[in-house]
From Swiss-Prot:
Name of protein: Na(+)-translocating NADH-quinone reductase subunit A
Gene: nqrA
Species classification: Bacteria, Pseudomonadati, Pseudomonadota, Gammaproteobacteria, Vibrionales
Subunit structure: Composed of six subunits; NqrA, NqrB, NqrC, NqrD, NqrE and NqrF.
Native source organism of the sequence: Vibrio anguillarum (Listonella anguillarum)
GO molecular function: oxidoreductase activity, acting on NAD(P)H, quinone or similar compound as acceptor
Enzyme Commission number(s): 7.2.1.1
Length: 446
């Protein structure tokens, strides 16, 4: 067991009940273009086209052969683009159940399927995009390979679902997915989990590793740091546990599996719980009549690193297993910094709230202050458990010094790894955004 001592479990109200419920009927789904780092689409459909489930919607010009497929059958009703014609979303009105099917196999055959057959089926179905590389967090090139694949079978994000609840419901498909992953690498498949018991693969290159401790103990960046540190040469792939289930279902049934169990939670959710829905589901429909009155912000993903779901991107993200909802923090407290703050959370113990152990806080979107200088008072070291110098790294990200940032370990990180640093930062810096700009420059300059 690897125990993490530094980190932070956010004491936020609205913890979900760990019982899976059926969600609302979804009539619109979407693929979100901006989720895929560096992707430039070649469109295969236009508004008005009828599509089947698993039919190709677009390909990636920069990553030849990688296909992005429809999560449902129906009609393309929107192709939304933003500044500089960047693809925001392809929206489909769900109708019918027509789908493209693929080869199916017996569970005993999966580990003996040759690698090229596995790759071809994953690419044609669109499930290849469930894999992401580290560094850079991009969909891997089809002809690439890796010595390490990480399966994230735990989740320490605030308000997250417990993976064992979902995995044990789909144990056969989960094991089948692990068998499929074992064929994609000559190296190891690392299944990273908490202390709970999970279904196990019998393949010799599939290993289980137990992590314990506060967030970010459940992030793949933390797992890689301790088990297989990545750099420009050592490239690892990662996948979440629900996509492992989708891999297994694809090869067992020959059908694209797009079901998702997400946590619908937060301080303004009426009944926080686990909800069964599908990839790309409209979050306006999913949260209809589920929220308390008032101005709220719906987030696809975690409250720490998720994306505001509004307008053309108001849909469940490809890699997100949560829908979090917070009240918009428009109100200002007169001399709030001088008040005792019984109902306020503070990492630096500035308010009385830290004295009430176990108290959950109705957090909002407010930053509790304006932008200011970066102040190194030890906050970053408290929440980043990786063996690196966070203050120096974050300073280099702010200054745009990519050479120094790379030496300090920037290639190991993704936006979610620095989300807690953003949360505890007195200067209100968005370190995830600064990291992405740094990684883009490093990749561009080779």
């Amino acid at each position: 067991m690897i125990t993490i001592k530094r980190g932070l479990d956010l004491p936020i109200a609205g913890t979900p009940s760990q019982v899976i419920n059926d969600g609302k009927t979804i009539t619109k789904v979407a693929l979100l273009g901006e989720e895929y780092v560096g992707m430039r689409p070649t469109m295969h459909v236009r508004v008005g086209d009828e599509v089947k489930k698993a039919q190709i919607l677009f390909e990636d010009k920069k990553n030849p052969g990688v296909k992005f497929t429809s999560p449902a059958s129906g009609k393309v009703i929107e192709v939304n683009r933003g500044a500089k014609r960047v693809l925001q979303s392809v929206v489909i009105e769900v109708a019918g159940d027509e789908q493209i099917t693929f080869d199916s196999f017996e569970a005993s055959q999966l580990a003996s399927i040759d690698r090229q057959t596995v790759k071809t089926q994953l690419v044609e179905s669109g499930l290849w995009t469930a894999l992401r590389t580290r560094p850079f967090s991009k969909v891997p090139a089809i002809e690439s390979s890796t010595q390490a694949i990480f399966v994230t079978a735990m989740d320490t994000n605030p308000l997250a679902a417990k993976p064992e609840t979902i995995i044990n419901e789909q144990s056969e498909a989960f094991v089948a997915g692990l068998d499929i992953l074992s064929t994609l690498t000559e190296g190891k498949v690392y299944v990273c989990k908490s202390g709970t018991s999970l279904p196990r693969s019998s393949q010799p290159n599939v290993e289980e590793h137990v992590f314990d401790g506060p967030h970010p103990a459940g992030l793949v960046g933390t797992h890689m740091h301790f088990l297989y540190p990545v750099n420009a040469v050592n490239v690892a792939w990662s996948i979440n546990y629900q996509d492992v289930i989708a891999f297994g279902q694809l090869f067992l049934t020959g059908e694209l599996y797009t079901q998702r169990v997400v946590s619908l939670a937060g301080p303004v959710v009426n009944k926080p719980r686990l909800v069964r829905t599908q990839i790309g589901a409209s979050l306006e429909e999913l949260t209809d009549n589920e929220l308390m009155p008032g101005e709220v912000r719906v987030i696809s993903g975690s409250v720490l690193s998720g994306v505001k779901a509004a307008g053309p991107v108001a849909y469940l993200g490809r890699y997100h297993l949560q829908v979090s909802v917070l009240r918009e923090g428009r109100d200002k407290d007169f001399l709030g910094w001088a008040m005792p703050g019984k109902n306020k959370f503070s990492v630096t113990r500035s308010f009385l709230g830290h004295l009430f152990t176990g108290q959950l806080f109705n957090m909002t979107t407010t930053t509790n202050g304006s932008d200011r200088a970066m102040v190194p008072i030890g906050n970053y070291e408290k929440v980043l458990p990786l063996d690196m110098e966070p203050t120096l790294l974050l300073r280099d990200l702010c200054a745009g010094d990519i050479d120094s940032a790379q030496r300090l370990g920037a290639l190991e990180l993704d936006e979610e790894d620095l989300a807690l640093c953003t949360f505890v930062c007195p200067g209100k810096y968005e370190y995830g955004q600064l990291l992405r700009e740094c990684l883009d420059k490093i990749e561009k300059e080779g």
